[in-house]
Amino acid sequence: MDRESCDVCGGDGYSSPSVTVDAVATRMRNGEIEALMIQRGPKPPEWHGKWAFPGGFVDVGEDPLDAVLRELVEETGVCGRNPTLLSVLGSPGRDPRKHCVGLFYRVDVDADSKPLAGDDAISADWVPLGMMSAENVAGDHIQVIGMISNAE
């Protein structure tokens, strides 16, 4: 199929999904696994008030490894290190805004860090995995919670 490119914007004529990254940080407290989570703001409305891993879109020209650490700081104020790819989720309907391929990274953080909500998050906190369900977690993040619950 012949695709037209644009010399002005650099577009290649392909309609491609966006790439997102999410930071998966966990700790053990009082015999329970807790994950560093944000409570989503009003956009998209389907996820308003639901828990999600801190994350966001990869900027043009940005390495996903840098993006996941940037998003972690922007949304929680927590610095991370050693991002390691945990999962890739890319179902076309996984995000109500548009087709997004999500890269979930395990990220090391200080287990005593005190998250502070930033960017578009309502709140940020360490949340016990046992308190999370499909009803209070945004989108397919519950699948990743299942992965880490079963692995630890």
Regions found by a protein language model. Give the residues of each.
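Helical scaffold of the NTase/Pol beta-like nucleotidyltransferase catalytic core
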Residues: 150-152
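Unchanged
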Residues: 33, 57-81, 89-147
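Short, glycine/serine-rich, charged loops/turns that create anion-binding
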Residues: 30, 42, 90
